Structure formats: C-alpha cells, structure tokens
C-alpha cells in the first residue's frame, strides 16, 4: 500500500484523543493514522496493565512516543481486574457456550473505565480503540463508553480507514519505519491478561487446521507435560481463593501462581468456534490455566453447599451473566442485579479443595466445607440409624401423583 493510496482527507473537530494502546499491530498503525487523518490532533496513548506480562509492556512508553503520541499513560489494573471483575463473574458460574471462561470479555470493562478516567484527566474530547469492525470488542468498548462518558466522541479506525487486512497494516507500518513484532508468517491476533491469552487469525481461520505448537504460549502441550501428577491445595472464602498450598496470597498473586503451576501440566487449553455478538462465528484458541483450576474449585465447593433449587438458580444466573459479560454490558442495572443475586450463594462457598493436575486435566480429588449439606451418615449405602427408608414411600406417592392421575385417565 503506497502513501498516496492511503492518503485521507483531514478531519477537524477533535483536538485531543486518548487511544487504547497495546503496541501491537493495530494500535501501532493507529497513532500515525490519527495524526494523518485528524487536523492538529494530540494523541495520548493509554495502556492498561492487566497482567499481560512484562514482555508486552517493555519499551511500550518509548514506542508510543516514537510513533507520534505526546504522552503515554500505563495504568496498573491487575489486582482490580482479578478482585473486582474476574472473581465476581466466575462466582456466578458464568461460562460462555459451555466452554469459554470469558478472559477477553471480563477485561474490557475495566480497560474502558480506566481509558475514560485518563480522558477526563487530560481533557480529551475523544477516545479511540483498535477493535476490528467484525468483532465483539468494538461493541464492548463502545458500550462502556456510552455508559460512562456519552459526551466523548468515539473513533474506530477499522470502520474508517481503507486498510482491510493485517497484511495492509504491515505494509503501512513498513512505509513509515514503525517497528512491529508481527509478520506475514506469524500474524495471529493475540490478547493476553492475567486470566488468559487468546489466539485468533492466520491459519486458525480454517477450522480444519490443527493449531500448531507455535500457537500456544501459556501452557505446555499435554503430551509433553510431566508424567507425574501434581496436587494443589486451595482454600476458599466466600467464593475467593485465599490460600494456595497453605500460602496466603492476594487474588492476583494466587492467579499468577496457579497459571504457572497449571500451565506446566498443560491445563486450560480450548479450541472453540463461538458465536460472536455481531452474528458470525469465529474460531479461537484460548489458554486459561489458573482460571480452569479456580473454576473447578468453585464448582466443587458449590456441589457441597448449594441445595438443588439454589444450584438451579445459580445456573440461570451464570448463563445470563456469561452472555451479559460477553456482550459488553457490564455497566448496566442488569449486571448489578445479577451480581447482587449471586452474592448470597457465593458467600456460602467456603472450604478446601485439592486439585490433581495431570496431562491437561484439572481434577478435583478432595473437597470439604463447613457449609456442606452432604452428610455421610445420611448418604451411606451401609447401615445407618438416621434415615428411615420407609419414609420414601409416601414421598414417592406424592411426587408421582400427577403421573398416576394422568395414567388413570388414559385407562378410562
């Protein structure tokens, strides 16, 4: 793509814009594009540290300035993300379409909120994101902006510029001598945070292609994992992991430790084709090692402490919450309502769990809770003196009464 072909008419009316900046392919191209597109516009780069790792943050400030930003604000959101967004979400049992633990989705509201806060701080009149016009994230970001700062103009370059592919972006950056770690042969779209990393694009766009070993970055291949299992002991209070192997840890540090331990055993990989909010299907490979262990631990205690109807209610809350988070509707009354409804149930999730990690599997092998409704004395198949089995007869007659009446009517 030549400079002449990529030229655009200068727009006025935006004096200062805060860009959600990652230093990746898309946002690296956006800074020069904004300067070329908007007349006399100051670009402020904003980067959310959500636990994506030091490698992604290293040199980010310098790169943003070299690309044309006047400032770069790097905001540490790691602990807040885990404590105030991830834990409340997984405590509802939210899991999208049965497999996806919502790693990208849960991070978007806190990033958008922090971006708005930076925009207010610097007096910006616009915010900008690098989300594709085909994806979910454009809806998530702009839904949050609408709820938090409806007065700010939103700039979405993927819906405006003439570039249509990541290959176009590579050419655009090469023409301007702006460095990027992406290449034509390694062109996955990745998004990482403390909870997970996602991989999309490139060879993965064909669901008949098995992901190569080079796709995965957070977990070892299960077949290459240790031949001996590892056991991890977790303590939970009100739906939160408070100790790992007896060590008290903050929510973020507990997750980091579990990521390391579970990732070494190949735990947390999924390869799915999901229904996007915008109507199309997309394929994603996700790695959520620590989160997979945490989710299993929560469900294990839940099995002990929730009665049947409470668990059915939690499942309804979890399904609705998963769609709400996936669809970018965190800052809504419905989200507050779902979180409020799930809290009395989450408060019961106290106890201890031992998880066995082996060759890609995280299996709960021990669990106990002070709130447990399970009683060995009642459930035993051996002799007991607490349960009169004759009591079941009257219960069964009442429980099956409607079926009995229907059958009698059919015999007439």
Swiss-Prot record:
InterPro entries: Arginosuc_syn_C (IPR048268), Arginosuc_syn_N (IPR048267), Arginosuc_synth (IPR001518), Arginosuc_synth_CS (IPR018223), Arginosuc_synth_type_1_subfam (IPR023434), AS_cat/multimer_dom_body (IPR024074), Rossmann-like_a/b/a_fold (IPR014729). PROSITE patterns: ARGININOSUCCIN_SYN_1, ARGININOSUCCIN_SYN_2. One of its GO terms (biological process) is L-arginine biosynthetic process. L-citrulline binds at residues 100, 105, 136, 140, 189, 198, 274, 286. Pathway: Amino-acid biosynthesis; L-arginine biosynthesis; L-arginine from L-ornithine and carbamoyl phosphate: step 2/3. Pfam families: Arginosuc_syn_C (PF20979), Arginosuc_synth (PF00764). GO terms for cellular component: cytoplasm. The keyword ATP-binding applies. Keywords: Amino-acid biosynthesis, Arginine biosynthesis, ATP-binding, Cytoplasm, Ligase, Nucleotide-binding. ATP binds at residues 20-28, 48, 130. It comes from the Bacteria. One of its GO terms (molecular function) is argininosuccinate synthase activity. It catalyses: L-citrulline + L-aspartate + ATP = 2-(N(omega)-L-arginino)succinate + AMP + diphosphate + H(+). It is found in: Cytoplasm. CDD domains: ASS. Its EC number is 6.3.4.5. L-aspartate binds at residues 132, 136-137. Homotetramer. Belongs to the argininosuccinate synthase family. Type 1 subfamily. This is Argininosuccinate synthase.
